[in-house]
From Swiss-Prot:
This is Ribosomal protein L11 methyltransferase. It holds the Pfam family PrmA. Methylates ribosomal protein L11. It catalyses: L-lysyl-[protein] + 3 S-adenosyl-L-methionine = N(6),N(6),N(6)-trimethyl-L-lysyl-[protein] + 3 S-adenosyl-L-homocysteine + 3 H(+). GO terms for cellular component: cytosol. GO terms for molecular function: protein-lysine N-methyltransferase activity. Its EC number is 2.1.1.-. HAMAP family: Methyltr_PrmA (MF_00735).
């Protein structure tokens, strides 16, 4: 049995403090969700993106721990609304497993969870469990990037995956023919997730390098960056240093209405050649000048 504590009416400036207290009380996992399904716009690099109204879900193994956490939070912050729910083992397992099925991107790329067989064993199959976070193909921007990679000619190409998250784009690129991918992120947890996913997909060090962005030195054929508008704009010169003339830059993580802002910001260093849209999000393709 599991015990889920749901916390509403949380001031955004207290989210980090509350999650730390939940961890101290024994929470096994903590998830932040958006009450109103709003998009996240332009958080600074290294910060946690927050919505106007955040709901916190904390999972506990013991009822006493969950109840104690509830009492402590409400005692300090009477405005919080905390509700406790009992989850049976089977229901908890289904809650996250039933939502994930193999997904196809383009004609030949599949992303499959470990507990289900690939629908097309001879296709390009990427094994990735949702529990490792940082991107599993379900978000529109990840889908846009995977679909673009699937149709691109990546054979013998060197690629930088800037803001690699789970490593899903890096691993897909390797399986689609890339010679070497440099997966970089400012978040150590993302680097660890990428390493774990690489191991699960039998990707070797000769195919994949995992590091912080500061380690990047050599120019590459392609940079793909599924991050947000503010960091994309700030990284323009860095991307230009890493891409020789004519090399490709693929960006996503930006809303449709933000696309013109990035195109304008990049105009001095890059030529915009293509745009794709999905569910209000955009993917932009540039070549380096």
């Amino acid at each position: 049995m599991w015990f889920q504590l749901k916390i509403e009416h949380c001031p955004n400036d207290k989210i980090e403090e509350i999650t730390e207290e939940l961890e101290e009380c024994g929470a096994l996992s903590i998830t932040l969700t958006d009450k109103n399904d709003n998009p996240v716009l332009e958080p600074e690099p290294g910060t946690t993106p927050l919505w106007p109204e955040v709901i916190i879900h904390a999972l506990f193994a013991q009822a006493e721990e969950a109840q104690y956490a509830r009492e402590q939070l409400v005692a300090k912050r009477p405005s919080l609304h905390c509700s406790l729910e009992l989850l049976a083992d089977k229901n908890w397992e289904r809650a996250w497993m039933d939502d994930f099925r193999p997904q196809r991107f383009g004609n030949r790329l599949w992303v499959c969870p470990t507990w289900l067989p690939p629908p097309e064993p001879d296709a390009v199959n990427l094994i990735l469990d949702p529990g490792l976070a940082f991107g599993t193909g379900t978000h529109a921007t990840t889908s846009l990037c995977l679909t673009w990679l699937e149709q691109a000619d990546l054979k013998n190409k060197s690629i930088i995956d800037y803001g690699c998250g789970s490593g899903i784009l890096s691993l897909a690129a390797i399986k689609l023919g890339a010679k070497h991918v440099y997966a970089v992120d400012i978040d150590n947890q993302a680097l660890q997730a990428t390493q774990s996913n690489a191991h699960a997909n039998h990707i070797t060090e000769s195919q994949l390098s995992i590091s912080s962005p500061e380690a990047l030195q050599n120019p590459v054929h392609l940079v793909i960056a599924n991050i947000l508008l503010a960091p994309l704009i700030s990284l323009k010169e860095r991307f230009h240093q890493l891409l020789p003339s004519g090399a490709h830059l693929v960006t996503s993580g930006i809303l449709e209405e933000q696309a013109p802002l990035l195109i304008d910001a990049y105009d001095s260093a890059f030529t915009h050649i293509a745009t794709e849209y999905c569910e209000g999000w955009s993917l932009l393709v540039f070549t380096s000048k």
